[in-house]
């Protein structure tokens, strides 16, 4: 443990969308000489990623309340009080100069514990529509960071920072001019894959004229890659289908255009990489936050927003034809995406934390 005055406590859990931006900030804190500790829950992805990063992980017992039965709701106040007490014990032990929450169930009890212990609290919201925990913590926070403008009502605490993403994504890819080669299309469905996209893309690309049809790299998810590859074969479309993408920076650098969901981190990475996109938001995301994320790029012309419910193979093929026949349109969209990126997001968030810590 670092000497008093050099500990920072990060709260993030559940999904990679919360954890990866927090890890980027953890590395920045460490580069500035701070010891980073992590508050999480036993079931989230943080249990794999945080130890891999060499960071001490402290766990509290808390789960979400949405969609739970009446008995769980009756127990909720007692569960939350217990979680706050667990978090308070950890905060008292670590004596951090600052606590920053990136979302997930852990953030609520942890944020309350920080306030009870008199430790400055900063929250960071990755999505264009704020999560429940972050909305509730706004009154307790010393600073509120939003990735996308307009997520929170304007106030003196608010800072628009962007999402911390990997710095290698901001490097300019050296691609040959489109006039000299076929366009390259990257399809992503997240680590588990997106089966609606796995079904839609082979059909849509079969309707794109062969002379315009792009090279395709399709990340289909662990359980869906063989079936997706067979769909492409049956559609007469050549495609490289893989369950995972191990090197995202390389994949983004290879692509000219992306078809994917609209998670907050994905949207921020597309901007960082300067990539045009077709965004098909997850229709059942909480508070429809993926649609709001997608609008950040779509409003400015860096992406096409195509709702899953109204997007069939013909509609997607028409959109792909539109841009594949106009390489200059792809270039314009790419420039717009890059203009919307926030390359200083990580350092800005850390600056804000240390500002409130040492004030």
Swiss-Prot record:
Source taxonomy: Bacteria, Pseudomonadati, Pseudomonadota, Gammaproteobacteria, Pseudomonadales
Keyword Transport: no
Physiological role: Cell wall formation. Catalyzes the transfer of a GlcNAc subunit on undecaprenyl-pyrophosphoryl-MurNAc-pentapeptide (lipid intermediate I) to form undecaprenyl-pyrophosphoryl-MurNAc-(pentapeptide)GlcNAc (lipid intermediate II).
EC number: 2.4.1.227
Catalytic reaction equation(s): di-trans,octa-cis-undecaprenyl diphospho-N-acetyl-alpha-D-muramoyl-L-alanyl-D-glutamyl-meso-2,6-diaminopimeloyl-D-alanyl-D-alanine + UDP-N-acetyl-alpha-D-glucosamine = di-trans,octa-cis-undecaprenyl diphospho-[N-acetyl-alpha-D-glucosaminyl-(1->4)]-N-acetyl-alpha-D-muramoyl-L-alanyl-D-glutamyl-meso-2,6-diaminopimeloyl-D-alanyl-D-alanine + UDP + H(+)
A GO MF label: UDP-N-acetyl-D-glucosamine:N-acetylmuramoyl-L-alanyl-D-glutamyl-meso-2,6-diaminopimelyl-D-alanyl-D-alanine-diphosphoundecaprenol 4-beta-N-acetylglucosaminlytransferase activity
Biological process annotations from GO: carbohydrate metabolic process; cell division; cell wall organization; lipid glycosylation; peptidoglycan biosynthetic process; regulation of cell shape
Protein family according to the UniProt entry: Belongs to the glycosyltransferase 28 family. MurG subfamily.
Main location: membrane
Protein name: UDP-N-acetylglucosamine--N-acetylmuramyl-(pentapeptide) pyrophosphoryl-undecaprenol N-acetylglucosamine transferase
């Amino acid at each position: 443990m670092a000497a008093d005055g050099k500990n920072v406590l990060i709260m993030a859990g559940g999904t990679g969308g919360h954890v990866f931006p927090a890890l980027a900030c953890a590395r920045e804190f460490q580069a500035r000489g701070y010891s980073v500790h992590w508050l999480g829950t036993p079931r989230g992805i943080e249990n794999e990623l945080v130890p891999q990063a060499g960071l001490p992980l402290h766990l509290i017992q808390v789960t979400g309340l949405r969609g739970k039965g009446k008995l769980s709701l009756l127990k909720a106040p007692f569960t939350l009080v217990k979680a706050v007490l667990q978090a308070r014990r950890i905060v008292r032990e670590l004596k951090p100069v600052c606590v920053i929450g990136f979302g997930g169930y852990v953030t609520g009890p942890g944020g309350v514990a920080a306030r009870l212990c008199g430790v400055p609290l900063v929250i960071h919201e990755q999505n264009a529509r704020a999560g429940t925990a972050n909305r509730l913590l706004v009154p307790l926070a010393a600073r509120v960071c939003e990735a996308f403008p307009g997520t929170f009502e304007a106030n003196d605490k608010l800072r628009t920072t962007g999402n911390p993403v990997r710095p290698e994504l901001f490097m300019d890819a050296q691609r040959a001019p489109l006039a000299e080669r076929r366009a390259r299309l990257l399809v992503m469905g997240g680590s588990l894959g997106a089966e609606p996209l796995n079904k839609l893309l082979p059909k849509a690309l079969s309707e794109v004229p062969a002379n315009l049809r792009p090279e395709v790299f399709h990340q289909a998810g662990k359980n869906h890659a063989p079936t997706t590859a067979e769909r492409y074969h049956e559609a007469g479309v050549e495609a490289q289908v893989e369950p995972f993408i191990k090197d995202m920076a390389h994949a983004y650098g290879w692509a000219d255009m992306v078809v994917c969901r609209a998670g907050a981190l994905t949207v921020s990475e597309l901007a960082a990489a300067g990539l045009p996109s077709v965004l098909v938001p997850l229709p059942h995301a909480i508070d429809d936050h993926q649609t709001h994320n997608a609008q950040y790029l779509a409003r400015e012309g860096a992406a096409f927003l195509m709702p899953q419910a109204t997007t069939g193979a013909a509609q997607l093929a028409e959109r792909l034809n539109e841009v594949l026949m106009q390489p200059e349109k792809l270039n314009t969209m790419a420039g717009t995406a890059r203009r919307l990126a926030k390359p200083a997001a990580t350092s800005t968030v850390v600056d804000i934390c240390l500002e409130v810590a040492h004030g």
